[in-house]
Amino acid sequence: MPRKSSRLTFAVLATGAGVFSMLQSLIAPALPTVQHALHTSQSTATWVMTAYLLSASVFTPILGRVGDLVGKKRTLVAVLLAVLAGCLVAALAPNIGVLIIARVVQGIGGALFPLSFGIIRDEFDASRVPGSISNLSAVIAAGGGVGMVAAGPIVTALDYRWLFWFPVAIVAVTTLIAVRYVPESPSRADGRVNWLGAVLLSGWLVALLLPLSQAGTWGWGSVRVVGLFSAAVVLFAAWLLSEARSSSPLIDLKVMRLPSVWTTNTAALLFGAGMYAIWSFLPGFVQTPSSAGYGFGASVTASGLLMLPMLLAMFVSGVLSGRLEPVVGAKTLLTTGAALGAIACAILALWHDQQWQIALVAGIFGLGIGLAFASMANLIVGSVPPEQTGAATGMNANIRTIGGSIGAAVTSVLVTGRLQPSGLPYGSGYTHGFTLLAVLLLGAALAALMVPRRSGRGGGKTVGGSGSVLLKAEEEASVMAPGALN
């Protein structure tokens, strides 16, 4: 692809993925405003986040696979139209029920991540693939930061509905440009969609993530939580059996068993647990009145500004990782990113009584997120055959989301386990929560050390047709100890 065309294609992909990532975090700081404006309860308002999470978890791997089969551009345009429709309905929603449905439709946009990675792999010169994936990952990571920072000023100056009107305009233009300029992928997977596998995958994901997100309201020992967890186990086993027997599996389990894939996914699970929990709880910590013995009583806007170093660091480190990856390898970058996250949480557990400490921690964590996002994507893309790119990267994103749900749920138990007479958590709850996140992120760094070195350096060398060669080599290597290739 000519450089000018590839730049335009990248701009389209980055804009779409960035908007979706922004939508993921944009509404969280505004939930109290939404609750008041739509005259609903806090427990109902949280479904605005839960519905989005569940929808994205279901559609990301399924539509990633559909893109591999029927064409990534065609699927990309359809997904962009879904996001556009979801944002438009959300901006006009007259009640909380319609807003929740709109968020379900927006969640379809989770497939933009695997589709974008697949288009880059199919269309860009092999030498430019790792850097482009790193840059796209930087935009995705920064998009979440933009959401946290921008929500307060938008709601204060305008109205919460503008959190959706702005994306409507951006996605509409992006869709038109995508139709005109993004090329259709030349690489197609053989077979069909395993719809039974898709239904079972959707079933166990919902049965797992729903109780994780609602256990604080329902109670961990409630019939609903225990029943859904039990259903998740049964449906997961049925899904594995269906995929193993299918001639055209939704997720190729052979690919998932590759040493470079399962170790990267393990790191993604643990890193996601730490990252999403920090995004969920650090703003609340900062906004807590200082009368609680901690916190700064910051407004939504002020807390967003304290997160600004994280946003800037995420983008800078994500872009720089594209230049560092051919030199030090994606494995080293992933290990470093997870270690930086662990250091940030350890600092936060020990020192959090000054605002500059929060800003410092946010910056360190942002550096880690930028490095980790880019390296995880490069490791997966460089380890699987071209026709499996969408499904494999979609599953990696899903595993990161599952980790985030687990991390947020466990941290919530620690933070809210004991409450002051005012109803606010004790500071020790946050300290214990931040300590746990440091341990989880340290685990992510250790998992990253297990990634086979051959796929950790020069990820661009494995793209294109050589993915099947690497697949065969790693299938043979998988019978050895995971560390044998380090």
Where are these regions (language model features)?
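12-transmembrane solute porter fold
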Residues: S6-L31, T40-Q42, T46-A51, S137, ...
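Membrane-interface helix termini in secondary transporters
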Residues: T33, P61-R65, L69, P153, ...
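Structural signature of the two symmetry-related core transmembrane helices
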Residues: R74-V89, V168, T332-A346
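Paired small-residue
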Residues: A82, G86-V89, G97-V105, W356-I364
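Cytoplasmic helix-loop-helix junction between adjacent transmembrane helices
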Residues: V105-A138
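Hydrophobic transmembrane-helix bundles of small-molecule transporters
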Residues: T156-A268, G272-G274, W279-F281, Y294, ...
